[in-house]
Every structure is written in structure tokens, then in C-alpha cells.
Amino acid sequence: MKFAYFNPTIVGVDDVPESIFQKLIDITVRAHERIDLNDAGDQSISVRGGQQIQLLPAHESLGIDIAPLRDYVENLAQRYLDNLGTTTAFDLSRLKPVLASAWTIKQSQGQYQALHVHDANISGNIYIDSPQFDPLSSVTDGKLELRLPVSRDIPRFVFTDTFMMSPNVKQCIVFPSHLAHTVYPWKGTGHRTVIAWDVRFVNKNSTQNLFEIQ
């Protein structure tokens, strides 16, 4: 996994191994067959158009084994946590990552995700499919944008910088859950399909969430 540092925010990008990716495709395809479980019409979530299917916690009728997803995400989160431990004075050795929630989103042109944050420690997107963009598309089309708070000395206001991620198939982005983020609409054909997830860091000897990573 590669890391980008924004003092103190850390963003990671990982290439998903092919053997794991094929299992994630299967999970995603099977989930989106359940159009009866589509949450995209719920205005309390960020999705504007398309289809969102909850994988964890899942509807009892979904019947999809997400063990490959859980194993990959928790291993990835541990690597993120190990890297975080090299940049902080906190002792993070007593923590372990636990997948708290996961869902898959499938959207077409003109559809997007509104600005939002997640209630967890770290979150991520695994890119399953990417659209073919129109030649006249904007440079932001279909991209995930993270809003990064950056302090400036003069006149000591807080400004916002951004980090943008294209929907590159077989890649996963990892970021702190408290970062506000959005996904831009686009023009073109095909779908932007992702598996999104949240992880909490808990005490290795219990399921208690110890603290929020800032």
C-alpha cells in the first residue's frame, strides 16, 4: 500500500490482488441483483441516484458470504494502522481493526454522492468497475474528492485543500472517516461501481472502541 501524508492526515492507496478482486466482483454482482434491497432512495444517505446495497450489516435474506471482503479490509486496515504507528507517539499495539459496515454502490452518468462523513475510524472505497468517460468530460468527473483541513498561519484561518481519486479498477483508497468527501457526477457510458466500508479500531481484548483517530 502507498501512503500520502497531509500533516497529520494519512491517505492510503492499495492495489487489490487479482484472486481477491475476483471474489469481490462476485459479491458485488450478486448484491446488485437484489434491486429490492436498494437504499439509494433514502435521502439520509449520500447516494443520489443509482443503487446501494448494504453488505454489513446485511438484510437477512441477502445470503452472501462476505468473508473475503472482511479478510482483505481488516488486513489492509492493519497495514494502515501499522503505518500510523510510525507517525504518532500513541501506543497503537493494543488495537485491532474490525470491519463495522460495508455496502456497494452502482451509479450511471449524472449520478453522484453528496458531501458526507462516516461514523468510524477509517473508511475506504474498493473500485470494482469504472465508466467510459465522455471525451469532453470535466477533469473532476466521477472522482472521489476528500476535503483536507489545512491550517494557515496568516491570518490564522482554517482553509481546505483536497485530494482527488479517480475510480481506478482494482484499487482501494483508505482515509480517516472524519474527512468530508464527495463523488462527482460524470458524462459517459457504463457504471461506477464500488464497495465502500468502515472500520473501527478496538481493544484486542474486547470489542470496545477506544478512541477516534484524528
Label for each model-derived stretch:
Residues M1-T87, D91, Y112:
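Non-heme Fe(II)/2-oxoglutarate
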Residues I10, H191-I195:
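Short beta-strand micro-motifs in enzyme catalytic cores
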Residues Q78, R94, Q107:
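OB-fold ssDNA-binding interfaces and closely related basic DNA-contact patches used
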Residues T87-S101:
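A short coil-to-beta-strand element that immediately follows conserved catalytic motifs
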Residues V98-V174, Y184, H191, F201, ...:
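Catalytic core of non-heme Fe(II) oxygenases with the double-stranded beta-helix
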Residues E212-Q214:
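Flexible, surface-exposed loop regions and adjacent strand-edge segments
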